[in-house]
């Protein structure tokens, strides 16, 4: 599975878990839709879930005039996924994580999602440097 596909499937899983409060394995199976699972995909989903508190704190510090629970569900899931990569996965360049998040926002979010996600992640990037 390509990393972009793994990110898309991870986003779908995290979105379902957040919205429907279903078990991670069930959400992952649903997102995979019969496809073979992938180590990177699993690392993303479980990594976000295991580190959600730290990730959410980092995101909250960089939200201007927004509360995390008021964000569009898909934007919140994209931010969590990308912030996880930026904070915890040293083998992936931060700019790659950001670009992938922006592409996910264009694909799954609304007209303003990509710009919003880019702004928040840029601030997180500055914090990490």
From Swiss-Prot:
One annotated Gene Ontology cellular component of this protein: cytosol
Keywords, comma-separated and alphabetical: RNA-binding, Transcription, Transcription antitermination, Transcription regulation
Protein's gene: nusB
Function: Involved in transcription antitermination. Required for transcription of ribosomal RNA (rRNA) genes. Binds specifically to the boxA antiterminator sequence of the ribosomal RNA (rrn) operons.
Family in the record: Belongs to the NusB family.
Gene3D superfamilies: NusB-like
Pfam families: NusB
Source species, domain of life: Bacteria
Keyword ATP-binding: no
Protein name, UniProt field: Transcription antitermination protein NusB
GO function terms (MF aspect): RNA binding
GO biological process: DNA-templated transcription termination; transcription antitermination
Entry-linked InterPro entries: NusB-like_sf, NusB_fam, NusB_RsmB_TIM44
